[in-house]
Amino acid sequence: MKFASTFAGFFATRRENGGTQTSRAVDRLMRPADSLRELDPLLIWSATGLLLIGLVMVYSSSIATAEGSRFTGHQSHYFLLRHAMFLAVGIGAGLAAFQLSMRQWQRFAPWLFLIGVMLLVVVLIPGVGREVNGAQRWLPLGPLNLQPSELMKLFVALYAADYTVRKLPDMGSFRRGFLPMAAMILLVGFLLLGEPDFGAFVVITAIAFGVLFLGGINVRVFALLALVAVIGFMLLIWLSPYRRDRIFGFMDPWQDAFGKGYQLSHALIAFGRGEWFGVGLGASVEKLFYLPEAHTDFLLAVIAEELGFAGVLTVIALFAILIHRALVLGREAVKLERYFSGLVAMGIGLWLGVQSFINMGVNMGLLPTKGLTLPLMSFGGSGIVANCLALAILLRVDWEVRQLKRGCGA
């Protein structure tokens, strides 16, 4: 609440696209060609640590699956090589994204959101979208598969920030401020539920509503609609038999350990076997065809088994540092009247925070099973590329903030 009121106070004074003469002058001078060593070291090292740990653990958790599958050609390095390739593509895309100023990202935001919606429509077309395990979430692009919902998380963070800046005078109005954005999110949610991808819908809703809240939307309106959203999500769960089964399996996984509670029970076994320092890297038993999706949704359970409580605590600490730096960076950008930049940074922080919290909660048995990967770490090309793009934008915000501080002080 204090965060929101603070940012609302800043937003009430000036808008991003207006700016000051000083910020415009500095903007003309800013080129990402030098001073890169000034970038936030905590942001860089926490993100690098998560990406590297993820690469190692994806390999460790996927060896048995790769060796036992004809799809992979029985090659033990299959998922490692693909994950490394996705990382290389993501880093390359991130380097390109870093070259764009935040003013350019603001101009692109509505178009990126529109492209994301179009991709979500295309993936639902029979014969176009690829179906895996009953979910039609992927667009086949030759040897690769694109998952539009992963890119949409980034696009929503950008669009929500741009929308908030443009609609700043109307943020206190339900009809003019909140309703148009809510309609867009409901459209996205309708398309995501058609795949179905309930988890992505939850994360995207959290990003959009969180950015609106930090941007100064009427608190009473926000509280009322947050309650409506929670009730709506509960109804969606209750009206869907397979989602309802997940709730029952979550409440007592051991009652049906070979059915509804299978994934959760084996995740808990992995956590129990790991104890304080784990059974050793590569020595997991649960990844040997006991724990489904060991290299994606349940990667943290394998980390817990092989590296123990110490490994899990390290991962949590790295995420906490990264998310904290994103939120602090957003606040600093707002203080310098870079409101779009600040909201984007905080939106990315919310995205990584909400998704990692849900994934960790599922792995630890604190939340019902949900098809969400661990950001920056789990196997998945679209997710890794989207995460790298988000990190590049965070670094761009950080770089521009540092340049503005230096320019204003000159």
Swiss-Prot record:
<keyword id="KW-0472">Membrane</keyword>
<keyword id="KW-0573">Peptidoglycan synthesis</keyword>
<feature type="transmembrane region" description="Helical">
    <location>
        <begin position="39"/>
        <end position="59"/>
    </location>
</feature>
<feature type="transmembrane region" description="Helical">
    <location>
        <begin position="78"/>
        <end position="98"/>
    </location>
</feature>
<dbReference type="GO" id="GO:0071555">
    <property type="term" value="P:cell wall organization"/>
</dbReference>
<keyword id="KW-1133">Transmembrane helix</keyword>
<comment type="function">
    <text>Peptidoglycan polymerase that is essential for cell division.</text>
</comment>
<feature type="transmembrane region" description="Helical">
    <location>
        <begin position="108"/>
        <end position="128"/>
    </location>
</feature>
<keyword id="KW-0997">Cell inner membrane</keyword>
<comment type="pathway">
    <text>Cell wall biogenesis; peptidoglycan biosynthesis.</text>
</comment>
<dbReference type="GO" id="GO:0043093">
    <property type="term" value="P:FtsZ-dependent cytokinesis"/>
</dbReference>
<feature type="transmembrane region" description="Helical">
    <location>
        <begin position="374"/>
        <end position="394"/>
    </location>
</feature>
<dbReference type="GO" id="GO:0008360">
    <property type="term" value="P:regulation of cell shape"/>
</dbReference>
<protein>
    <recommendedName>
        <fullName>Probable peptidoglycan glycosyltransferase FtsW</fullName>
        <ecNumber>2.4.99.28</ecNumber>
    </recommendedName>
</protein>
<keyword id="KW-0131">Cell cycle</keyword>
<dbReference type="InterPro" id="IPR013437">
    <property type="entry name" value="FtsW"/>
</dbReference>
<feature type="transmembrane region" description="Helical">
    <location>
        <begin position="342"/>
        <end position="362"/>
    </location>
</feature>
<dbReference type="GO" id="GO:0005886">
    <property type="term" value="C:plasma membrane"/>
</dbReference>
<keyword id="KW-0812">Transmembrane</keyword>
<keyword id="KW-0133">Cell shape</keyword>
<comment type="similarity">
    <text>Belongs to the SEDS family. FtsW subfamily.</text>
</comment>
<keyword id="KW-0328">Glycosyltransferase</keyword>
<dbReference type="InterPro" id="IPR001182">
    <property type="entry name" value="FtsW/RodA"/>
</dbReference>
<dbReference type="GO" id="GO:0008955">
    <property type="term" value="F:peptidoglycan glycosyltransferase activity"/>
</dbReference>
<feature type="transmembrane region" description="Helical">
    <location>
        <begin position="303"/>
        <end position="323"/>
    </location>
</feature>
<feature type="transmembrane region" description="Helical">
    <location>
        <begin position="221"/>
        <end position="241"/>
    </location>
</feature>
<dbReference type="GO" id="GO:0015648">
    <property type="term" value="F:lipid-linked peptidoglycan transporter activity"/>
</dbReference>
<keyword id="KW-0808">Transferase</keyword>
<keyword id="KW-0132">Cell division</keyword>
<dbReference type="Pfam" id="PF01098">
    <property type="entry name" value="FTSW_RODA_SPOVE"/>
</dbReference>
<keyword id="KW-1003">Cell membrane</keyword>
<feature type="transmembrane region" description="Helical">
    <location>
        <begin position="177"/>
        <end position="197"/>
    </location>
</feature>
<keyword id="KW-0961">Cell wall biogenesis/degradation</keyword>
<feature type="transmembrane region" description="Helical">
    <location>
        <begin position="198"/>
        <end position="218"/>
    </location>
</feature>
<dbReference type="GO" id="GO:0032153">
    <property type="term" value="C:cell division site"/>
</dbReference>
<dbReference type="GO" id="GO:0009252">
    <property type="term" value="P:peptidoglycan biosynthetic process"/>
</dbReference>
